[in-house]
From Swiss-Prot:
This is Urease accessory protein UreH. Belongs to the UreD family. It is found in: Cytoplasm. It comes from the Bacteria.
Length: 265
């Protein structure tokens, strides 16, 4: 059962406004969601912060998010803080998110890290639909638990799926299953002693594989790599012993990408 009286829903639709910048065309949300009005940190790039007025996700919480980024929009979506998944007891918390990015539109989806507490169980499913001219920078950062309390990999289970389609054809699928009961999370094929994991996907972004590799190599405290996926798109996987190194790496990649995109005439 959801902690709230109804399923938690968020709807956001954007378009190009009269001044040529991305604006909110329509939105709807139920508790605990809220939206901040867009602001414009650089040129025609809009930034919207998603707010969740709650201490975190609990047993039975179910979130349904639908985001539609209009044609020619340039938008960065952020969150207000680290997201906490509390003890879900014998249940789980879930999120289903569907994102549509229109023609010649750019979306930088940059939430803060996800922290599963002891005995937390979370299921996340994200589907992103793009056009051939859409540009996407999408990431998630997963933490091993409440690291400061030495509560590492004490969560029950964490399962996230990311599916990206371009013109209705699948170009990327990620199926992350972290189950400490059945897998040694410190195995060299898993976290290998690290506590924070970054998964970042770039589609049609104006940055070369060699450029991303250089940013990874110059990032202190980061063990990561970049690989090419379908049609020369890029995927970055990185580990660290804190959130800051991964957030800094992500920001460097995003800064290079958005500077190039917003400079286009």
């Amino acid at each position: 059962m959801n902690t709230y009286a109804q399923e938690s829903k968020l709807r956001l639709k954007t378009k190009i406004g009269a001044d040529g910048r991305c604006v909110i065309e329509d939105n709807f949300f139920t508790p605990p969601f809220k939206l901040m009005a867009p602001f414009y940190p650089k040129d025609d790039l809009a930034e919207i912060m998603l707010l969740a007025v709650s201490p975190g996700l609990m047993k039975g919480d179910a979130q349904d998010m639908q985001l539609s980024i209009g044609q020619n929009c340039k938008l960065r979506i952020t969150s207000q803080s680290f997201e906490k998944i509390h003890n879900t007891e014998d249940g789980f918390a879930s999120r289903d998110m569907h994102i549509v990015v229109g023609e010649n539109a750019f979306l930088d989806f940059a939430p803060f890290p996800l922290i599963p507490f002891e005995n937390a169980h979370f299921k996340g499913n994200t589907t992103i639909s793009l056009r051939s001219s859409s540009q996407l920078l999408y990431s998630e950062i997963i933490v091993a638990g409440r690291v400061a309390r030495n509560e590492l990999f004490k969560f029950n289970r964490l399962h996230t799926k990311i599916s990206i389609l371009q013109d209705e054809k699948p170009i990327y699928y990620d199926n992350t299953i972290l189950d400490p009961k059945t897998t040694d999370m410190n195995n060299m094929c898993m976290f290998d002693g690290y506590t924070h994991y970054l998964n970042l996907v770039l589609v049609n972004c104006p940055i070369e594989l060699s450029g991303v590799r250089g940013l990874i190599e110059e990032s202190e405290g980061v063990d990561g790599a970049v690989s090419e996926i379908a049609s020369s798109h890029l995927c970055v996987k990185a580990l660290a012993k804190g959130s800051e190194p991964l957030l800094h790496l992500r920001e460097k990649i995003a800064r290079f990408t958005t500077q190039t995109i917003t400079q286009k005439v």
